[in-house]
Amino acid sequence: MSSETVSYFSHPFPRRQSVGVSVGGVIVGGSAPVVVQSMTNTDTADVDSTVAQVAALHRAGSEIVRITVDRDESAAAVPKIRERLERLGHDVPLVGDFHYIGHKLLADHPACAEALAKYRINPGNVGFKDKKDKQFADIVEMAIRYDKPVRIGVNWGSLDQELLTTLMDRNQAEGAPLSAQDVMREAIVQSALISANLAEEIGLGRDKIILSAKVSQVQDLIAVYTMLAQRSNHALHLGLTEAGMGTKGIVASSAAMGILLQQGIGDTIRISLTPEPGGDRTREVQVAQELLQTMGFRQFVPIVAACPGCGRTTSTVFQELAQTIQEDIRRNMPLWREKYPGVEALSVAVMGCIVNGPGESKHADIGISLPGTGETPSAPVFVDGKKVATLRGPGIAEDFQKMVADYIENRFGLGRKIAS
């Protein structure tokens, strides 16, 4: 596995060299930063709800959005969705997720084939027995005709059973057979690589192919992607399938992908969270961004550092202020990205007592150290490492919020440009 040293922030890390793929103008792989993507859970045939969700995901920061294309009505809706999104100013690449009848839907709906930025093919259900290679080839030829990339997405829940059986039988004939788990991992990797080789034989360029091999267990995911990275230079899409709900899904996805990303493996990621009933679908985008930003690979939103609290911080003021600042940042980022270029690099500290508060606040671009239990009811504020004010009274939170807003305007806004 060849690698190069790439620097995001100030931290170099070994980045696996892969072939870059353009997905609707968004580069995946090569020397491009790791791309964040997401998937809708609406009925694609429902144009209004799908447009609304894609727009929300794009506003949240998703750089590519995948939609289900499972029947004629869904395929017919895709061009309408694309057109409506463009009218709303959301020029985000749409990926068509095809299973079982993708070859037929693309052939019957040329406007859908044209509107999509990428096709996802699952080798495990693209076709069965003697129809498998033909139907796979049909989709690849469609991608060539419309100049679209494909993601060959293997999933262990729908793995090619003929391939798995062949490898299991061959393994049993060996003198020292591998475990069933190892054979399963090998089958997943081979399914992706065999399909990629077939696509290239048909005429699809390597710069049009992205691979993924999704499983639901952390150690399996690490093993499978490590094998893929060692045996090919295709761009890789990372994702832990069926990660689950809430903190379990976040922790599992972050643990698996964090290890792979630190090794330089992975060109685009999706955090597959099961949303709670009525939950916000954009949560998966936020988690993906926070994973990449926490590891120092990309910058998306200003970082708010806050202490966890202890017996010295019985007041909830610092917790409420940290939450308010974080929510305010998330809410304003779509506007700030346009108005304040570079604001993503901002760091804010909201600390709860005198022990670490002043020191942490000095390390941030702007920080406040609120009084802990029994401390003098005052809050020093630090800007660029220097103490600039001491806030007192019931309006500390509001005063600090205004100072943050003023700092952003002065550092990233029009005032900075005029001064320079």
UniProtKB/Swiss-Prot annotation:
It is an enzyme of class 1 (oxidoreductase). Pfam families: GcpE. [4Fe-4S] cluster binds at residues 307, 310, 353, 360. Binds 1 [4Fe-4S] cluster. Its EC number is 1.17.7.3. Pathway: Isoprenoid biosynthesis; isopentenyl diphosphate biosynthesis via DXP pathway; isopentenyl diphosphate from 1-deoxy-D-xylulose 5-phosphate: step 5/6. Its cofactor is [4Fe-4S] cluster. One of its GO terms (biological process) is terpenoid biosynthetic process. Gene3D superfamilies: Dihydropteroate synthase-like, Sulfite Reductase Hemoprotein, domain 1. GO terms for molecular function: 4 iron, 4 sulfur cluster binding; 4-hydroxy-3-methylbut-2-en-1-yl diphosphate synthase activity (ferredoxin); 4-hydroxy-3-methylbut-2-enyl-diphosphate synthase activity (flavodoxin); iron ion binding. Keywords: 4Fe-4S, Iron, Iron-sulfur, Isoprene biosynthesis, Metal-binding, Oxidoreductase. The keyword Ribonucleoprotein does not apply. It comes from the Bacteria. It catalyses: (2E)-4-hydroxy-3-methylbut-2-enyl diphosphate + oxidized [flavodoxin] + H2O + 2 H(+) = 2-C-methyl-D-erythritol 2,4-cyclic diphosphate + reduced [flavodoxin]. Belongs to the IspG family. Converts 2C-methyl-D-erythritol 2,4-cyclodiphosphate (ME-2,4cPP) into 1-hydroxy-2-methyl-2-(E)-butenyl 4-diphosphate. This is 4-hydroxy-3-methylbut-2-en-1-yl diphosphate synthase (flavodoxin). It comes from Brucella suis biovar 1 (strain 1330). The gene is ispG.
